[in-house]
Amino acid sequence: MIKNYQEYKEAVEKLKRWAYAYYVLDNPEVPDEVYDKLYREVEEYEKAHPDQIDPTSPTQRIGAEPAKEFKKIKHLSKMWSMEDVFNQREMHEWLERVYKNAGRKDLQFYIEPKFDGASLNLIYENGLLKSAATRGDGEVGEDVTANAKTIPSIPLGIDYKGLIEIRGEVVIRKDDFEKLNHERALKGESTFANPRNAAAGSLRQLDPKVTAQRKLYFYPWDIGYNTLNFKYQHEKMDFVYQQGFIKPFKRAICENEEEIQQLYEEFSKERDKLPVMLDGMVVKVDEIALHEILGYTVKYPRWMVAYKFPAVEKMTRIIDIVPQVGRTGVITPVAILEPVEIEGVVVERATLHNYAEIERKDIRIGDMVIVIRSGDVIPEVTKVLTQYRTGKEKKVERPKVCPVCGQPVLDEGILIKCQNLSCPARVVNSIIYFASKQCLDISGLGEATVKLLYEKGLVKDVVDLFKLKKEDLLRLPGFAEKKAQNLIDATQSVKGVECWRFVNALGIEHIGEVASKKLCEKFGLDWYKAPKEKLYEIEGFGPEMVRSIEEFVEVNKEKIEKLIELLQPTEPKKEEEVENSPLAHKTVVLTGEMKLPRSKIKELLERAGAHVTNSVSHHTDYVFYGENPGSKFQKAQQLGVPLLPEEKMWELLKEAGIEA
């Protein structure tokens, strides 16, 4: 409990440091529960002492009442648009114009990613965030200050005390975009066409609490008004990052066209692997004195350009719309497309989410549509181009029976479900999910193998996986001695799996990884015996989740007990046992090759109470290393962080009562 103002200030600084490590460095220093506990203590102190609240306290991010409309804010200096180039020839022509107007060729160019989101202008005064506004017309934008304060990667306070504008892009990560669209589709709400629209729409919410739920990030790309004297663009950005903003994954200084093109190709290759959308890279003349010499057109500066990637959105035609049955019985319509290449990948199918979405967008077979693809995000139809209709397009009927088993479906309006638990599609997809990486992670049990096992009658249920015999597998096409033995070994190796992984693998509707952990922490392996009123005691469990558990257990109780007998899942360690672990509350880092996969070791360490992070800092307690350790080993040596071999890690885990 915080007793006085000094302790309060120390707690606020600690929260700010932890939040910076989590949201900006992507390297959490403490577990969520430690952060949450101190956050609540700070909140309580602020309620008792409202006159002492630090405006940069993380608690001040959310709290503003919903606005009736957005006010206007005039930018201190103009927010310019940017010229685009789309290929090497156009880039060459832009460079030639720059060289000609600058009167010299010995120039350097500062390169940074072009994030695909919503532009935002932040004004800081006396070290505090004074306002945040959208680009608007470049002169005047909309006041979204309350919303910007909910974005954790935007500092509420900076070290610099002068008046300054810091500009950047608000983005949503690809996986969060996919989840957001999925949730909206389930609720019957319109989905966002792409991550850029999702970021812009989330930033322009009248209620800041809605913005806070959208998991937005802010990447700075320039300084507007300022009284500082920078000589180079890269110095400007170094200054910005020193104030606590996120650095991009890559930035560089190039000296000629060849280096710029090489970097462009590197950006293109890494684009799909990144958590956020890029639509190109920005090339700026690094020497700021040249900016005024090169000047501006009516629309954009002549000293910078966006070197754009090929589009991730393409036009194509829907050939057919077919229904697919998932593991929970939900029937999802999928568009079969005329093949179209997007970023080097041929796209032939795209999700349509649900039949309510088809009706809302009036999607028909034969329509010309816009399709988006981004990295791991499933290709999606975002827009119907009705101007291309000929009158031959066909409307899509909502299915009355399951397309796989032929049984009548339950039509809930937004969702349509097959309720037949023995439906082949439901069974196969349940087994695929059960064996998947995020569940039991049974090696060698992919989609093709599961379908083969089901078609040959060897597996009709997840329980059958643990009854497989090598002689049966050897009769299957593609199975030789080694492959058959590997699959048997893989199914047996999951014995002793953690309770929460077992629960998560069952595929109970609305019960994911987080809820599975909470269930097991509260009830252990007896989770399925817990009465309804006890389930409601778990934080975050509402009627929908409780009903899902009840309905699942009612139908599958015998199967749950059989699987517990076969798998012998491990009970979660009690809090007092974790406290006695030599690894309790230790921040650790792994480097090098070890005898088990990194994900498995991370789980074991977390069960022992450790917090596993991705990079080494002064706050790291141990770095455990295996064969061929990487740069983290050298970083630990430089910082004086204890380096322990893999064998020592296993000793500490054993001491904590954790067996591999």
Curated annotation (Swiss-Prot):
Its cofactor is Mg(2+); Mn(2+). Disulfide bonds: none annotated. GO terms for cellular component: cytosol. It comes from the Bacteria. It holds the Pfam family DNA_ligase_OB. Residues 578-660 form the BRCT domain. GO terms for biological process: DNA repair; DNA replication. The keyword Zinc applies. The active site is at 114 (n6-amp-lysine intermediate). Zn(2+) binds at residues 402, 405, 418, 423. GO terms for molecular function: DNA binding; DNA ligase (NAD+) activity; metal ion binding. It catalyses: NAD(+) + (deoxyribonucleotide)n-3'-hydroxyl + 5'-phospho-(deoxyribonucleotide)m = (deoxyribonucleotide)n+m + AMP + beta-nicotinamide D-nucleotide. Keywords: DNA damage, DNA repair, DNA replication, Ligase, Magnesium, Manganese, Metal-binding, NAD, Zinc. InterPro entries: BRCT_dom (IPR001357), BRCT_dom_sf (IPR036420), DisA/LigA_HHH (IPR041663), DNA_ligase (IPR001679), DNA_ligase_AS (IPR018239), DNA_ligase_CS (IPR033136), DNAligase_adenylation (IPR013839), DNAligase_N (IPR013840). NCBIfam families: dnlj, PRK07956.1. HAMAP family: DNA_ligase_A. Belongs to the NAD-dependent DNA ligase family. LigA subfamily. This is DNA ligase. The gene is ligA.
